[in-house]
Every structure is written in structure tokens, then in C-alpha cells.
UniProtKB/Swiss-Prot annotation:
Protein name as annotated: Cytochrome b
Cofactor annotation comment: Binds 2 heme b groups non-covalently.
Membrane topology: Multi-pass membrane protein
Function: Component of the ubiquinol-cytochrome c reductase complex (complex III or cytochrome b-c1 complex) that is part of the mitochondrial respiratory chain. The b-c1 complex mediates electron transfer from ubiquinol to cytochrome c. Contributes to the generation of a proton gradient across the mitochondrial membrane that is then used for ATP synthesis.
Cellular location(s): Mitochondrion inner membrane
Principal location: mitochondrion
Keywords: Electron transport, Heme, Iron, Membrane, Metal-binding, Mitochondrion, Mitochondrion inner membrane, Respiratory chain, Transmembrane, Transmembrane helix, Transport, Ubiquinone
Signal peptide: none
Protein source organism: Perognathus longimembris
Gene name tied to this protein: MT-CYB
Length: 379
């Protein structure tokens, strides 16, 4: 008799994806972040569901409903801080996951990579709308500034902004629709993640050497299922350390002040995970130019498969490209720091140099380095 997991229509799908899946024998800890992102998404959906039971999407009561959750609801403070810091954890895993993809050439699986870029945009949109919901000062002014960027779109810009706002400013209608979208998007993300996996399983996973491993595969379970459990345990240990000991370390103190349209905070800035893109946006003195640079800072990821000039897939044996990769990582740290600083010298010029370097490394230096390395290896 055949084992049920191999015959039952539903079990068969799970079996092919998580049990008998042929996996390269040498994938490292950097391959753990996909499953960790799944764990983050589950945490966010569950905590978000319980928060939504007590939250009211109304300008008059939103702020106090969050305070009520923290003060009066059983373990409400824990659910709220898990949700807020879960977003940060989500982006930490996301950036590691993308970095792994760039380093090891996983972007050569074009369909999987492009779905991943769509997922990144969806997660960014969800996080932005979620940040507006507590209706603190930074929520209100962040929503005002970021939605206002759409007014830079020629001809339809102003109408588009008012259409998104549902009025002539960020108000009750905006908060209400942001809550609706913030609730539905994680389920769309979950569906897209399944498509992401579907495309990945068409080709199989890449590995640190960047060479085919079809002749030497091992089953996902028990090897990688236990490895993922260990990764998940480590992630949860780190997560609860932040949530229980430093719950406000990653947030903005301004968001503990209720939203006031008559009082602008001295420094309007997004959450830390958007600061690199915010710095690129601010580094261009023209509004439309800044918006284009902002979108391109993420869309440029889609060009990686086309800019790949090396005859080797991964950076494992490519020292010049490795150096460029780590300069790019350092550059992103600099951009993140600049995004949180006021717009004044010397931060303006540092931000502009870092922004130029970001695009130069990806669009020009990576392809050149690949060609130089081919020449050095006489390929």
C-alpha cells in the first residue's frame, strides 16, 4: 500500500513542497530566511487579527483604542508590541533574503525573483499603511508626506492624491481605507508567497556554489525541516528579547503623541526599514525626480538577471564582485543613517553621494566586475 501523503490530493501537495522535496545537500543558513519570512507572516496575521478585534479605524478614537489595547486588554501590550516589532523582524529577514539572492545569483530564476520583487512592494505598502493606523504624529505626517509624493505625477497627480485621501487632506476616510487595505494585503502576500514557492519548486533551489546539484539531492524532511525549526527557534528568541526588553527601541517617540494636523513634527521620517529609500528620495532636489529615484531604488532589482555578465552564478569565487557587494551593503547602511538625519549639510551631500554610489554599483560596476573576472579566469 502506498503511503497516504503520496496519494491524498491535499497531502500530496504538502509532501511535494515540504517533505519529499529534492533539495541541494549544501545550502547554508542563508537559505533559512524564506521559511523565517513565512513564520513572520504568520505572526503578523495572527497578532494583527487580534489587534483588529479591539482597534477602531476612526480619527477620534484610533489613538485611544491602541492605548486601550495596551492598558485594558489581556496581554494586549504583548500583542501590540509583537505586531509592531514583527514588522521590523519581517524586514530584517526580507533584506537578508534579498541579499542572499544577490550574493548567490538566485536572481537567475527570473520568475521567482520577479514575484519576489512584487512581494517586496506589497510588504512595503502593507507596512506603510499599518504605520498610519495608530494615528500618532508620525502616522499622520508620514501618511501626508508619502501620499503627497503622488502629486508629482504629471497631469493626474493632484486628483490621484485627493482620490486616495478620500477628501482634501488625510482624514477619517483615509484612515478607514488604509485599515481595510492593511487587513487584506497580508492574505494577498500569503497567496503570492505560494506562487513564489511554486516557481521556485519548478527549478529547485540554488546553492552556495552556484552549480547544478540535480545529481546530488537530499529530501527536505528531516534534514531541512529540522534546520528550519532551529532557525525559527533562534528567530523567536531574538524576537521576544526585543519585544519583552526593548519594545520601543525601533519605534519613533513622536508616535506616542496623538495626531495633530496643526503641529508639524521637526523631523518627519518613516520607520527604520524605509530610511534608505527615503534618503534616495530626498537626495534629488526635484519632486518628480525624487519619486522616480525612490521607485527605481527597488525596481532596479528586476535588472539583476540582465546585468549578470559573469560565467559563474554566485559570488563565492569572485573576489572583485564580493568587494563590490559589501561596499553596496555598507552604502545601504549609510543611506539608512542619512534618512534619519535632518536635511542640512553635511548630510545632504553624503546622501547624494551614497545614492549615486548605490545605482552605480548595481548598474555599472557589477557588470564590469563580472567581465573582468571572466578575463582573469580566461573564460
Amino acid at each position: 500500500m502506498t503511503i497516504m501523503r503520496k496519494t491524498h490530493p491535499l497531502m500530496k501537495m504538502v509532501n511535494h513542497a515540504f517533505i519529499d522535496l529534492p533539495t541541494p545537500p549544501n545550502i547554508s543558513g542563508w537559505w533559512n530566511f524564506g521559511s523565517l519570512l513565512g513564520l513572520c507572516l504568520i505572526i503578523q496575521i495572527l497578532t494583527g487579527l487580534f489587534l483588529s478585534m479591539h482597534y477602531t479605524p476612526d480619527t477620534l478614537t484610533a489613538f485611544s483604542s491602541v492605548a486601550h489595547i495596551c492598558r485594558d486588554v489581556n496581554y494586549g501590550w504583548l500583542i501590540r508590541y509583537m505586531h509592531a516589532n514583527g514588522a521590523s523582524l519581517f524586514f530584517i529577514c526580507l533584506y537578508f533574503h534579498i541579499g542572499r539572492g544577490i550574493y548567490y545569483g538566485s536572481y537567475m530564476y527570473k520568475e521567482t525573483w520577479n514575484i519576489g520583487i512584487v512581494l517586496l512592494f506589497l510588504v512595503m505598502a502593507t507596512a506603510f499603511m499599518g504605520y498610519v493606523l495608530p494615528w500618532g504624529q508620525m502616522s499622520f505626517w508620514g501618511a501626508t508626506v508619502i501620499t503627497n509624493l503622488l502629486s508629482a505625477i504629471p497631469y493626474i497627480g493632484s486628483d490621484l492624491v485627493e482620490w486616495i485621501w478620500g477628501g482634501f487632506s488625510v482624514d477619517k476616510a483615509t484612515l478607514n481605507r488604509f485599515f481595510a487595505f492593511h487587513f487584506i494585503l497580508p492574505f494577498i502576500i500569503a497567496a503570492m508567497a505560494m506562487v513564489h514557492l511554486l516557481f521556485l519548486h519548478e527549478t529547485g533551489s540554488n546553492n552556495p556554489l552556484g552549480i547544478p546539484s540535480d545529481s546530488d539531492k537530499i529530501p527536505f524532511h528531516p534534514y531541512y525541516s529540522y534546520k528550519d525549526l532551529l532557525g525559527g527557534a533562534a528567530l523567536l528568541a531574538f524576537f521576544f528579547t526585543i519585544v519583552l526588553f526593548f519594545p520601543d527601541a525601533l519605534g519613533d517617540p513622536d508616535n506616542y503623541t496623538p495626531a495633530n494636523p496643526l503641529n508639524t513634527p521637526p523631523h518627519i521620517k518613516p520607520e527604520w526599514y524605509f530610511l534608505f529609500a527615503y534618503a534616495i528620495l530626498r537626495s534629488i532636489p526635484n519632486k518628480l525626480g525624487g519619486v522616480i529615484a525612490l521607485v527605481l531604488s527597488i525596481l532596479v532589482l528586476a535588472l539583476f538577471p540582465f546585468l549578470h555578465t559573469s560565467n559563474q552564478r554566485s559570488l563565492t569565487f569572485r573576489p572583485i564582485s564580493q568587494t563590490l557587494f559589501w561596499i553596496l551593503v555598507s552604502d545601504l547602511f549609510i543611506l539608512t543613517w542619512i534618512g534619519g538625519q535632518p536635511v542640512e549639510p553635511p548630510f545632504i551631500i553624503i546622501g547624494q553621494i551614497a545614492s549615486i554610489l548605490y545605482f552605480t554599483i548595481i548598474l555599472i560596476l557589477f557588470p564590469i566586475a563580472g567581465m573582468i573576472e571572466n578575463k582573469m579566469l580566461k573564460w
